[in-house]
Each structure stands twice: as C-alpha cells, then as structure tokens.
Amino acid sequence: MNARTLMIQGTGSDVGKSLIVAGLARAFTRRGLRVRPFKPQNMSNNAAVTAEGGEIGRAQALQARAAGVAPSVHMNPVLLKPQSETGAQVVVQGRRVGTARAREYQGWKPRLMACVLDSFGRLRAEADLVLVEGAGSASEVNLRAGDIANMGFARASGTPVVLLGDIDRGGVIASLVGTRAVLDPEDAAMVRGFLVNRFRGDPDLFADGMALIAARTGWPALGLIPHFPEAARLPAEDVLGLRGAERPGGRVVAVPVLPRIANFDDLDPLRAEPGVSVVLVAPGRPLPAEADLVLLPGSKTTIPDLIAFREQGWDIDLKAHVRRGGRVLGLCGGYQMLGTRIADPHGIEGELPEIEGLGLLDVATVMTPDKRLAPAEGVSLPDATPFRGYEMHLGETRGPDAARPLLRLADGRPDGAVSPDGLVCGTYVHGLFADDRQRALWLGRLGAAPSGASYEAGLDSTLDALADHLERHVDLDRLHALAAG
C-alpha cells in the first residue's frame, strides 16, 4: 500500500520549509509512522553523503535523521550545485550527470521529472507518510512551465500542498494572498491550507490576520507557529543561514566566507562550543590578527575561490598569521588551496589549466573527473584518536608534506598533510568536528576546554524540541488527514 503524501511549499526562500518538514518528520515518527522526507529538486552546495555513495542536500539528510532512517539518494533526486551566477552542476539520484546553465537546464526538466517520480515512488512503497519539501517560492509562475520542484511536481504526483509563510520578515499577508492571486486555478486547488511561521509576541494579536488570509485565499489556517530560537542549533543548508558565534574571551576560529563555500556545516559543532568564537570573515574584511585558528572551508569551485581569496588580500593575512605562530586547517577545497599549485587539465572548474596555490603546504593537486563520495572513518595521527566523517571531493593531492598525513583511514589510506612545524594541516575529510573526540582534540590544540557535550545527541534533542513545538501549535491530526493516500 502506498504512503500518504503531503507537500510543504513556501511563499519564498528561507521561510522555514526545511525546518518544518524536519519537525513534522520527527513528530509523526514518534507517533509510530514510517516517515520519509523528499525534495524533488534542491539547490545547495551543502551536501551529505549517503550509504549508496551518492549525495543529497544536507537538509534532507537532517530530515532523514528526524525520521530515524538513513539518508538515501531518492530523498533528493535532483541536486543543483551552483558553480557560477548562471550555471550549476547537476546531480541526479546521487550521481553527477553534467553541468548546465539556467536556460539550458529548462530543457532537461522533462527527463528529470521521470527520475523524480521514480524516486518518489520508491519512497512511497516503503513508508506510511512521505513529507515533501518544495523549493524557493510557489509563486514563481514565470518558471511554472516544466516545473519539477513545486506545483509541477504536486500536480504530477497528486500530492496536496500546505503553503508556508514567514511573518518574521514582514509582509506575510501579502505573500500568502499574493501567491493565491498568481497561481492558476488548477495549481491553487492543490493547496489545502496555510501555516504562518516564526511569529513573535501574543498570537491573539494576529488572529484577525489569520482570518483575513483565510478569507482572501479560501484556504484554511492550519497553524500559527511561534519563533523557535533553538533552530540555530541545527545545521543550515542555505548560505543565507550561515552563522558565526562570536563570544568575548573565546578561542577565535576565523573562517573566510568564500563565494562558493561548500559543506559549511563543518562549522556548526564549533559554534556550539561555549569556549569558541567562530568569526565569519566577509569580503572586504581582513582575517583577524587575534585568530587562534584560520579554517579554510570547502569550496564548490576551488580555483575561482582561490582567485577570490587573493583578491581580498587574505593570502597576505594568512601568511602573517602563520608567521605569528597561528594554526591553519584546510578542509577539502581549502586543503587544495594550501598547496603549491592546483592543475585542472580536464577543465572541470573552467578555462584556467593551472594556478599557483598559497604555498603553506608542500603538496600539489590535480583535478580529476571522478568524484569520491563515501563515509570515512579511521584515526588521526600521530595520536590515534578515532574519527568518523565523510569524503566528497574531486582531485588528488600529493607531495612531501603528504608524507606526514593528518589522518589514516580504516582501509589504510593516508589522508591530508601536515607542515614540518605542525601549524598548517589539510584534509579531505568533512565532519571531523561533529565527532566529539576530534573536536576535543582540536580544542585542546587551541588551548580551549571542550564542553563535553555530545554534538549528535544535541541534534536529536533539538529535533525532539522542534517536534514538541509543532505538536503545540499545529493540528497534526488534521495535517495527516489532509495528506493524500
């Protein structure tokens, strides 16, 4: 028997769709239902590795965690990873299939809809309830032809829609009523009701607003959801949600915000540490001289981001930081930047065949067409502290400093490199700081006392609190009844 299905669409980006689906997934799972999250099309450079060796949006991985199941490539069958202002890498059912510019991508959509519906059918066959997340805004009617992310998917799959608005940014009445006004009648008929998210203050003061929206749209109000401040403890997928955590007196970890920063959830466990101040360095600002650690994050396009890094003068700041005895850690693309050169003989990242690196590690990288996607575990060196994380990268890095690897993987492969003085390190492994043992090790190197709290347990505690929050403010029985079976 196929599962019931319900789709949460939004009036815009960053209105809380991912968070609400995660909370609903945990709430319905606690009621004994087999829940699966699903997002037909996602656009993000913050990806997660699945057990199948594929990649999906990080939000769907969190939603899978909320549902108590392993992430699957079928939870996000189309993932777009932006490489420029107009083009993106296209990942289908976990595998990279090519790159496309925005106009070119429109022609791909009919073929991609078949993949989307295939993955959706697979999830329905193993679940009691599939919770679907839309993308961006439901009101982008200029993109409606061939749509696979919002109403196009809802209509093709027969999935009812609940529309989510965000009152915190202002204009929620206009955004919900305006969405109703621009939808064609068949699309509007898919909407079964609306939710208003991130309300602050006395809910009685917005009762007239909820009634007005219902009257103007013909959609019933399904809940007014108060602001949930604990959401800041959960990983953000969109770069709009990238957050620092500056604390006076804490050990300073400085992170340059690269144009195509990727997998920035590596920062979240550090943000959660009370003895650490995570400083996001925006373009136009220097790397802070007081930094204890400069962390070069992952990048979707290493060579263009390295060029941008130099344009900001951060290369000069970084070398001054090392001369002062400061530590540097490069993760994935950040690791590649730290070497002496990066070669791109296949033109994977553009037309530049080679670029000089920052020269802080005596290693060189060659970009290769094959992407490594896999969970990773092993020990760090020389202390033999265990770790769990994941690999998600193009390219191979070799050189004298790689003879001092930072990690040794369970299959015996060395990973990463360490400079002769031990101050500069690089690794291809993401997720190190989410491992409590590795986070404690690195905090010790910085002279900070770890909190001792389990990061993973903290995620589950926050998901439970989110589910409790939705139980109080949304009629979940009614939502379940609205889902199509």
Swiss-Prot record:
Tell whether Transport is among the UniProt keywords: no
Q: Describe which pathway this protein belongs to, using the record's wording.
A: Cofactor biosynthesis; adenosylcobalamin biosynthesis
Superkingdom of source: Bacteria
Q: So what family is this one in?
A: Belongs to the CobB/CobQ family. CobQ subfamily.
UniProt cross-references to HAMAP family, sorted A to Z: CobQ
UniProt keyword Signal present: no
Which PROSITE patterns does the UniProt entry name for this protein? GATASE_COBBQ
User: What this chain does, per the record?
Assistant: Catalyzes amidations at positions B, D, E, and G on adenosylcobyrinic A,C-diamide. NH(2) groups are provided by glutamine, and one molecule of ATP is hydrogenolyzed for each amidation.
Q: What positions does UniProt annotate as the active site of this protein?
A: 332, 430
- Give the matching PANTHER family: COBYRIC ACID SYNTHASE, DETHIOBIOTIN SYNTHETASE
Q: Recite the UniProt keywords alphabetically.
A: Cobalamin biosynthesis, Glutamine amidotransferase
Gene Ontology MF, one: catalytic activity
Protein's name according to its UniProt entry: Cobyric acid synthase
Q: Which residues form the GATase cobBQ-type domain?
A: 250-438
Could you give a single Gene Ontology term from the biological process aspect? Answer: cobalamin biosynthetic process
Report the leader peptide range. Answer: none
